[in-house]
A protein has these predicted regions:
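Acidic, serine/threonine- and proline-rich intrinsically disordered appendage/tail regions
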Residues: 166-170
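N-terminal secretory signal peptides and thylakoid transit peptides that target proteins
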Residues: 1-21
Length: 190
């Protein structure tokens, strides 16, 4: 009788271990453990800190600068984390990504290759702005004619007023310079 109990115990533990391994290896479980709740494709929480995202010095590039403001849209926010990512040129992969922190005046700046576009959409750069427990996701949309914001961005950022809210873009030769200001407050999580 003792042998049967040991055999049953062994079989039960083996079945539980096999079930555990099968569950742990499913992609949905792994995605649930590692996926950040970004509303945009391509986000990677393990992005390295860098501001030059270019893979080539030849070709079309974009320089994005801006200031991060508080909830009133008046006071610059220093030392906030800004993560950016976009589709790589001539690719449908999000290999262009970087992370930076705002300076003491709330300024940030990065340079990148001109992004590829998803089918049916304009080129865009995605942003995740974080400070303490506050997180905000948004996107900067642009093309050869100018830089634009989404309706969601306008709804969440209108405290900046027209002068700071709408991005500006200047292009010369193969370089486009975009100024894109942001604000952050505890009611902005999307």
């Amino acid at each position: 009788m003792t042998k049967n109990s040991s055999r049953r115990l062994f079989l039960r533990k083996t079945a539980m271990a096999t079930t555990g391994i099968a569950l742990a290896s499913t992609s949905s479980l792994l995605n649930g453990l590692t996926k950040d709740d970004s509303p945009f494709n391509g986000y990677n929480p393990y992005t390295e800190q860098k501001t030059d995202l270019r893979t080539s010095l030849i070709g079309k590039e974009v320089i994005v600068t801006g200031t991060l403001y508080d909830a009133t849209g008046n006071k610059p926010v220093s030392n906030a984390k800004i993560e950016v990512w976009h589709l790589s040129p001539n690719s449908q992969k999000y290999n262009h990504r970087g992370k930076m922190y705002t300076d003491k005046n709330g300024h940030y700046k990065f340079i990148s290759d001109w992004p590829n576009q998803e089918q049916g959409k304009q080129p865009r750069i995605y942003f995740k702005v974080s400070q303490n427990d506050t997180v905000y996701f948004t996107e900067l949309i642009f093309n050869n004619l100018g830089a634009h914001i989404s309706c969601k961005h306008w709804e969440k950022q209108h405290v900046l007023g027209e002068e700071k809210l709408f991005p500006t873009m200047k292009t010369s030769l193969n370089t486009s310079k975009i100024n894109f200001n942001l604000s952050i407050n505890t009611n902005q999580y999307i």
